[in-house]
């Protein structure tokens, strides 16, 4: 007789005091160049592929977790949230209201704009990113126009595209179209009729979100030939209605199936803080564009940290919204269970304004997910500091410090301590069991859903047109079985229970955003790509709950490591708790403002 299967304790009976944190130990080869090509041939081979994927899954406990374990919980195929208490000190925006009206309402939640603080006379001020309200002030006061700023952007894009090495932030850029958009905005200002505070604001769109008339390729070489773009994605249409100007389609890790940003098709986006290092991904181009100063904000997608990871590595803000808070209609992946469209921005204030414009659930999500009312924090409320002082921050210390270099966790801890000493917040120790099971369930969930979307094209002869690292991922994803998928959804229910229990004690959960700072780009990866699951696991270590459970999360820059590379602190919130995250993130941003550094590759488009 065989050995009886492992059985997990029912989730309600798990003794948290007996839980011991185990640092993950991922086993997979690091491959570039010819070795990557050979590995892909083996993975796709009918003779060797099944054996190789079986070994990889066995070595990384995937088979044991999903095939050899009895999991007593029911599957959770979509995030399921209990009713949430109303957030304090917020302004309701209304899910179905016009985005222009919502942005106008959100504007009243921000401190009054003082040009003297943003445009000081005399000595050169410390480095600050220009904010959306700085551009609005410059346009309204006649300092500059959207057309002038557009020319600075065009010059910056051309300059960095011709650098050695080049910095390919965009996969589609049309200077004439940008000039046309800017001219229309300039006329509105000349006539005294700007549409909103976002009129004339330049924003980039990740290449897996439709922005008419540009194609959506997902940074492949072929997707625009099999899928046409007839109109804007919903989130883009909402921004366009506010007067936003779109600078083009931003580079990304091909089809979002990686978190470094490597892309041999269009060139790998480079980190503005150190051009020999990755931006992180998959929203690599959006992060590089915002970090380098070429736009105030960008829209990316986040299915496995793809907004938060590059935002952290590039030293900017990345907000991942609750699953179902933003309408994914018009994105290449608009029917998965882990992905959302969300903003990257130079400041929390700008993230708040862009979020106010794009938020709003689609009708089906309103029926199934029952989102809490859409709101933003009232940062000028007399109670704002008191609300901040009442915040309880959850911290799983052993997990928090499981990073490649203690510079990362110590810097994040310093930011939390500064927040607590400034406002009176409390840090509470929490325990989150089964983090490795969570990682496995996420890999199987996003992998199976991606493979389901791409397999028809794969089988129709497009296999060799994918990059090698995408083909590696698809070969692994295609080996997952229905049993693996259902078992992963059972794990999803367990992990949701643990987080719901933690949120009975705390308001937000704090972690470093990534387990490493920006990794170096191997020269050998530029032509054929790279497969490095160990580095990817470090980058994704803390972000997965946001996707598997659909929870909102935000990353805020809080300092740099010894090499001068940005470090991000992540805050994970309750379902639909974006307002609370934005409030706490705004306070942390202000406390750490002097620690931000001008990227070595930076273009001042407002004061060029």
From Swiss-Prot:
- Which keywords appear in this protein's UniProt record, sorted alphabetically? Cell membrane, Endoplasmic reticulum, Hydrolase, Lipid degradation, Lipid metabolism, Membrane
Entry's EC annotation: 3.5.1.-
Q: Which SUPFAM superfamilies match?
A: Amidase signature (AS) enzymes (SSF75304)
The places in or outside the cell where this protein is found are: Endoplasmic reticulum membrane; Cell membrane
Q: What is its main location?
A: endoplasmic reticulum
Q: What are the recorded Gene Ontology BP terms?
A: lipid catabolic process; N-acylethanolamine metabolic process
Task: Summarize what activates or inhibits it.
Answer: Inhibited by methyl arachidonyl fluorophosphonate (MAFP).
Q: Which residues form the active site?
A: 206, 282, 306
Is rRNA-binding included in the keywords of this UniProt record? no
- Catalyzed reaction equations: N-(9Z,12Z-octadecadienoyl)-ethanolamine + H2O = ethanolamine + (9Z,12Z)-octadecadienoate; N-hexadecanoylethanolamine + H2O = ethanolamine + hexadecanoate; N-dodecanoylethanolamine + H2O = dodecanoate + ethanolamine
GO CC term (a single one): plasma membrane
GO terms for molecular function, please? Answer: N-(long-chain-acyl)ethanolamine deacylase activity
Q: Which residues bind substrate?
A: 303-306
Query: Could you list the residue ranges forming a coiled coil in this record?
Result: none
Keyword Acyltransferase in annotation: no
What the entry lists under InterPro entries is as follows: Amidase, Amidase_CS, Amidase_dom, AS_sf
- The highest taxon in the source lineage is Eukaryota
UniProt subunit comment:
Forms homodimers.
What the protein does? Catalyzes the hydrolysis of bioactive endogenous fatty acid amides to their corresponding acids. The hydrolysis of endogenous amidated lipids terminates their participation as lipid mediators in various signaling systems. Converts a wide range of N-acylethanolamines (NAEs) to their corresponding free fatty acids and ethanolamine.
Q: Which family does it belong to?
A: Belongs to the amidase family.
The name this protein goes by in its record:
Fatty acid amide hydrolase
- Gene name, per UniProt, is FAAH
